[in-house]
């Protein structure tokens, strides 16, 4: 094959590469078949020829190198054909390398040799080349010509694996020549030798073999070379060798302990100095070359990695930290990174802080953190935060790090931005830095930046909330999904733990500042400004943040996993919050208890703290429970707070017992139930368990099975009794409560347990100390006769003292059975229904309790009696009433200002009202009547609170009994001249009262009582011991011209006047006197005396006006009075009666009353009014035709839908129409007859007593009495 066979092989290339005169003799196999068509045989002949120009040789070598790069495998096959040819070619190139002075030619030869020897199966060639290099160095008289050889060796060792070891083992004496090169005054040679040394020491095996060489010969020489290096190549290669040396502890120790003298170059007179590695590296740090600065930083880091404790001091004494801090302001990320690494390791040495390097450098660190936030290199940001954290953590407390509040604020802002980073690693490192930052000595620069600290915590918690709510990717299946989920949970737990540690340190900071008056608030805040930058505001924020963020995050995480360390930090936060805001500790403790934190803490102790494991968690749990229990007991919601002495006792057994409680609930119950002999320490643990269960139940955390707890508490109490022990009151309280709330209807206590309870309670001076306000506890004490007889009175008193005063709002006028009562009241009612005898205890409470408690008892009794119509209580408690009333009267004597007396009288009147049928008044009732009348006689009209219920009772007593008893009762009351005198005063007060006043209901009762007394005296011809004087003109004036008088008072006066009219003003009891001497003006006045005709007409107009008001009760009273008036007039002058009944205004009145719609005439008062008009033949008021229309309407009405009052009034109207013969029409007569027959076939039973008697505005009223 010739060059012509290759079209791409040009003539010029052939002339350059081939020896034409000899190439034809060469075997074609030495010719590369692709471009460039190098003939190796030609190259071997051309390169050694001295007559060939260097340019041509260089071109040949370049083409061979190009072919080696482009067609590596082909060239490898080419040279591998004959090993001898290959070795010869290597020797030719090596000879050319050492013979030429052209640096580029030398570099080209080195590159070809290196590339060629890296081909497969070149071991013999490599060995040959090593021998050539060894021979060359040994034969050199001066190391000045060793540059090419040493450079080649360095490249070969770097490229060929294992060559360094082989070179050291087989050519060890080369090291002596290399030492000669280091002292040769040529930095190029020195640089190549350092490069070679660096590659040799990069091999651990070679480094071990060369350790003695370094220790004895190279160390000092190298350090001197490093110090004196001027060219960048030598500096970089020296630093490269240093990096390799610093990988090994031995060389680090040797070089760090070595110092070498260096002569001054500036002046002959200048004495020589000694240098060391820290000083040399400091010089590189001071250079303006970034590469050297970075390399120097790397070397410092490499030294410190081995042992900061051994070597950091030397660097600190060399002031290295100062310059590292300066480099933090560099724009080079790699330089800042390197400086961070050095400073992190230097921070492990206390001298780093005692020489105040951190004080001078902290500002640079903060600025660097602020600058790194603008970079995209998150690892750099993380490393800076790590350095900041190390400084903050290790800084001695006595050396203040932040010398101004402004710098502290800048640091806080930098951390705030860092923790808000979306990169998890940055945020996590920022959390650790924040924990270290929140230290008292770091925040003591006044004024304390509470606002900045709050912003920092807000950012920290917000970032944690955001991360904790990140959903897990569950799309993958199987074990991979499980592993990913576990890793994600661990990451969340670690992040949350760091957050909680930071928050805990903030809480600790707040506690420590409480004792610092100067740290309470910012003195530079304007007085009118809002006090946000204060310790108090910061402390309140901590509590709020824990409540709204920390607790929810921990609870959510605990659903996935439970980390002991995390829970330890969390509980320590809760514990510290009790101290931070003392005035909120009780409220906070209640909220924690309501959120099941007692259960949570006990479960943690049971799970992790059994035996001696997690002792720190056990301590934190015990301390948290201790303070929470004391807080709950010191200001409980439903029971009396403990005395200081009791708190001390509780504190003692909690302190001793809580650390030893680490059992699960079943084990705790079994421990509590142990009936064997119990030692003092064990008993304290039982007290602790019982108290924890009690507080948990109080706050509705019922994690203990109630049936099992019920049995365990009984066993516990019997154990105490067996050993003759008397438990502390708080233990009794807990036991009673748990027995009450855990027992059901079917689980009754054994008599032995009841006996033990009674014995324990009798040893307690006041049940207030063991009472817990709960309906089940009330039922517990009242369900067992042995407890009720001894403690029922006091328990009920405590019950009402704890009840809220909201019973006054209960509507006792509502229909029974329809009112929805509060839970506690409903529970009490159930107890009263099951045991009515408890009502006697309640009556005693009315007498013996404070006014507020007695009022609650009264309301409860009133509502209970109103709601429970089937409970017969009159006979049960009437005797009790008499005894209590007598005791009150004896106690207060002539005074009527007893606070409970009105309440008792109210209840007495209510019980009287609850009588459903007429009953004979027995001796007990008569005595009560006598006592009440005596009491009224001692009162003045101002005693409204006593007189009103008393008058109600007297009124009901007269109207709720049989006629014979009414006569006896009236005789008793009429014998009380003091009562009659009081009534006279009350009646006279009517004319002085203006409008509606608080005394108006009492005046109404007085008029009704007077009317009743007058009727009973007149009907029974009873003896009168004192008369009542009433001004008739005032009565008529009040009714004729009513001015803002209440409807009830008007009805009462009407009833009085009606009684007087019915008696024709001849009552022996009531004397109606005129206002003054008024001569009779006409004969009619004489006939009507003591009334005058004008008064009659004025009274008629007044009655009409009152009827128009359409008040049902007032209307009935008006009609009754009108009936009595017309009867009175008819008896004296029928013409005047007819004239009064036929007044035109009566027709207008009638039609005014009938405008209420269809069948509006079917109202009792209207029917009675029409009956009067028919009776007195007032055709001008009600014509025959209109009567017929009324009859037609009545015939069509469903009688079953009408009330008894209406039916009776309708029956009276029809009878009156029939008797007057007003109907001439046969059809109408039949209609009338049919209606009468329909009514006669029906019976008109008397209205039930409890429906007849009303309580209107506090006034007892009998509808039958008003209606007449």
Curated annotation (Swiss-Prot):
GO terms for biological process: gamete generation; male meiosis I; meiotic cell cycle; meiotic spindle organization; meiotic telomere clustering; oogenesis; polar body extrusion after meiotic divisions; spermatid development. Disruption phenotype: Mice are infertile due to meiotic arrest caused by defects in chromosome synapsis. They lack zygotene Rad51 foci, and are likely to be deficient in meiotic double-strand break (DSB) formation. In addition, mutant spermatocytes exhibit meiotic arrest at entry into pachynema, whereas oocytes progress to an abnormal metaphase I. MEI1-deficient oocytes are capable of fertilization. The zygotes are capable of initiating embryonic development but mostly arrest at the 2-4 cell stage. Among all the zygotes, approximately 5% are androgenetic and do not contain maternal chromosomes. Keywords: Meiosis. Strongly expressed in testis, weakly in brain, and not detected in spleen, liver, kidney, small intestine or colon. Disulfide bonds: none annotated. Required for normal meiotic chromosome synapsis. May be involved in the formation of meiotic double-strand breaks (DSBs) in spermatocytes. This is Meiosis inhibitor protein 1. The gene is Mei1.
């Amino acid at each position: 094959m010739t060059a012509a066979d290759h079209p791409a092989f040009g003539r010029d290339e052939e002339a350059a590469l081939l020896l034409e005169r000899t190439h034809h003799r060469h075997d074609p196999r030495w010719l590369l078949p692709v471009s460039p068509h190098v003939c190796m045989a030609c190259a071997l002949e051309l390169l050694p020829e001295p007559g060939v120009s260097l340019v041509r040789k260089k071109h040949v070598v370049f083409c061979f190198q190009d072919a080696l790069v482009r067609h590596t495998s082909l060239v490898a096959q080419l040279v591998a054909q004959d090993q001898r040819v290959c070795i010869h070619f290597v020797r030719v190139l090596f000879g050319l390398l050492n013979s030429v002075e052209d640096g580029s030619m030398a570099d080209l030869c080195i590159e070809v040799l290196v590339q060629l020897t890296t081909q497969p199966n070149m071991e013999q060639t490599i060995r040959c080349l090593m021998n050539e290099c060894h021979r060359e160095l040994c034969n050199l008289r001066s190391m000045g010509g060793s540059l090419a050889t040493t450079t080649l060796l360095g490249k070969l060792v770097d490229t060929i694996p294992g060559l360094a070891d082989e070179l050291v083992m087989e050519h060890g004496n080369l090291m002596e020549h290399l030492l000669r090169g280091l002292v040769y005054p040529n930095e190029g040679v020195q640089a190549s030798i350092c490069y070679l040394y660096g590659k040799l020491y990069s091999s651990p095996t070679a480094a071990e073999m060369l350790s003695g060489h370094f220790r004895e010969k190279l160390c000092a020489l190298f350090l001197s070379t490093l110090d004196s290096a001027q060219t960048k190549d030598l500096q970089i290669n020296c630093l490269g060798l240093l990096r390799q040396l610093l990988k090994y502890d031995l060389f680090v120790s040797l070089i760090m302990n070595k110092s070498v003298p260096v002569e001054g170059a500036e002046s002959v007179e200048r004495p020589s100095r000694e240098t060391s590695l820290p000083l040399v590296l400091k010089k590189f740090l001071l250079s303006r070359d970034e590469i050297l600065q970075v390399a120097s930083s790397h070397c410092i880091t490499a030294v410190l990695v081995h042992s900061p404790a051994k070597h950091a001091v030397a660097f600190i004494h060399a002031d290295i930290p100062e310059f590292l801090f300066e480099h933090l302001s560099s724009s080079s990320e790699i330089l800042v990174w390197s400086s961070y690494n050095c400073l992190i390791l230097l921070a492990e040495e206390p001298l780093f802080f005692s020489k105040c390097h951190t004080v001078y450098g902290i500002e640079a660190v903060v600025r660097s953190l602020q600058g790194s936030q603008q970079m995209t290199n998150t690892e750099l940001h993380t490393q800076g935060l790590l350095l900041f954290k190390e400084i903050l953590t290790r800084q001695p407390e006595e050396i203040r790090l932040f010398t101004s509040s402004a710098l502290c604020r800048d640091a806080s802002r930098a951390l705030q931005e860092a923790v808000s980073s979306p990169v998890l690693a940055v945020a996590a490192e920022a959390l650790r830095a924040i924990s270290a930052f929140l230290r008292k000595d770091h925040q003591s620069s006044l004024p304390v930046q509470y606002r900045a600290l709050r912003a920092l915590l807000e950012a920290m918690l917000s970032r944690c909330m955001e991360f904790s709510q990140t959903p897990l990717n569950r799309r993958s299946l199987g074990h991979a999904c499980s592993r990913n989920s576990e890793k994600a949970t661990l990451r969340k737990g670690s992040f949350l733990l760091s957050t909680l540690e930071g928050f805990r340190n903030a809480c600790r900071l707040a506690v420590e500042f409480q004792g610092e008056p100067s740290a309470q608030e910012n003195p530079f805040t304007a007085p009118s400004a809002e006090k946000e930058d204060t310790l108090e505001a910061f402390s309140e924020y901590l509590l709020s943040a824990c409540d709204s963020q920390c607790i929810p995050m921990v609870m959510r995480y605990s659903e996935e996993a439970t980390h002991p360390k995390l829970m330890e930090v969390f509980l320590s936060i809760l514990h510290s919050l009790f101290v931070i805001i003392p005035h909120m500790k009780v409220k906070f403790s209640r909220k924690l208890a309501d959120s099941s934190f007692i259960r949570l803490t006990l479960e943690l102790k049971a799970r992790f703290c059994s035996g001696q494991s997690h002792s720190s968690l056990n301590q934190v749990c015990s301390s948290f429970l201790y303070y929470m229990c004391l807080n709950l007991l010191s200001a409980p919601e439903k029971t009396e707070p403990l005395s200081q002495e009791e708190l001390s006792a509780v504190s003692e057994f909690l302190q001793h017992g809580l650390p030893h409680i680490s059992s699960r609930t079943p084990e705790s119950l079994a421990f509590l139930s142990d009936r064997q002999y119990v030692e003092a320490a064990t008993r304290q643990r039982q007290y602790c368990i019982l108290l924890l269960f009690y507080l948990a139940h109080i706050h509705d955390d019922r994690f203990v099975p109630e049936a099992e707890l019920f049995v365990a508490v009984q066993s516990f109490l019997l154990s105490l009794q067996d050993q003759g022990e008397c438990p502390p009151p708080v233990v009794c309280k807990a036991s009673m409560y748990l027995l009450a709330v855990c027992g059901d209807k079917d689980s009754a206590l054994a008599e032995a347990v009841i006996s033990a309870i009674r014995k324990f309670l009798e040893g307690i001076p006041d049940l207030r100390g063991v009472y817990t306000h709960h309906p089940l506890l009330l039922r517990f004490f009242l369900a067992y006769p042995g407890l009720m007889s001894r403690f029922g009175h006091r328990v009920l008193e405590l019950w009402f003292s704890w009840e809220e005063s909201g019973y006054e709002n209960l509507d006792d006028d509502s229909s029974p059975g329809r009112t929805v009562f509060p839970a506690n009241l409903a529970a009490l009612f159930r107890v009263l229904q099951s045991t009515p005898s408890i009502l006697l205890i309640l009556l005693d409470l009315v007498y013996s309790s404070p006014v507020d408690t007695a009022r609650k008892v009264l309301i409860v009794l009133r509502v209970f009696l109103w709601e429970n119509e089937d409970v017969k209580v009159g006979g049960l408690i009437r005797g009790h009433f008499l005894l209590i009333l007598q005791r009150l009267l004896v106690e207060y004597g002539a005074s009527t200002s007893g606070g409970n007396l009105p309440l008792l009288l109210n209840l007495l009147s209510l019980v009287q009202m609850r009588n459903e049928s007429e009953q004979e008044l027995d001796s007990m009732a008569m005595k009560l009547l006598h006592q009440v009348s005596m009491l009224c006689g001692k009162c003045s009209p101002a005693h409204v609170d006593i007189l009103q219920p008393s008058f109600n009772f007297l009124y009901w007593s007269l109207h709720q009994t049989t006629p014979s008893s009414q006569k006896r009762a009236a005789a008793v009351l009429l014998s009380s001249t003091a009562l009659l005198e009081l009534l006279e005063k009350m009646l006279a007060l009517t004319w002085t009262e203006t409008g509606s006043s608080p005394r108006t209901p009492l005046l109404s009762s007085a008029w009704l009582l007077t009317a009743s007394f007058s009727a009973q005296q007149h009907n029974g011809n009873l003896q009168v011991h004192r008369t009542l004087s009433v001004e008739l003109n005032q009565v008529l004036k009040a009714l004729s011209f009513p001015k803002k008088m209440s409807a009830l008072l008007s009805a009462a006066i009407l009833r009085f006047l009606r009684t007087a009219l019915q008696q024709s003003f001849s009552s022996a009891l009531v004397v109606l006197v005129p206002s003054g001497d008024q001569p009779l003006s006409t004969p009619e006045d004489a006939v009507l005396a003591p009334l005058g005709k004008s008064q009659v007409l004025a009274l008629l107009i007044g009655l009409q006006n009152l009827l128009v008001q359409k008040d049902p009760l007032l209307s009935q009273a008006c009609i009754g009075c009108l009936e009595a008036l017309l009867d009175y007039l008819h008896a004296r002058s029928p013409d005047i009666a007819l004239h009064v009944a036929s007044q035109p205004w009566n027709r207008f009145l009638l039609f005014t009353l009938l405008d209420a719609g269809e069948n509006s005439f079917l109202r009792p008062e209207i029917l009675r009014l029409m009956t009067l008009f028919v009776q007195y033949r007032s055709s001008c008021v009600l014509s025959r035709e209109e009567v017929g229309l009324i009859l037609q309407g009545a015939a069509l009405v469903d009688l079953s839908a009408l009330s008894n009052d209406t039916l009776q009034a309708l029956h009276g109207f029809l009878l009156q129409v029939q008797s007057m013969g007003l109907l001439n029409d046969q059809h109408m007569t039949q209609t009338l007859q049919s209606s009468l027959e329909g009514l006669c076939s029906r019976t008109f039973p008397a209205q039930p007593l409890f429906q007849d008697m009303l309580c209107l505005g506090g006034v007892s009223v009998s509808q039958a009495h008003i209606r007449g």
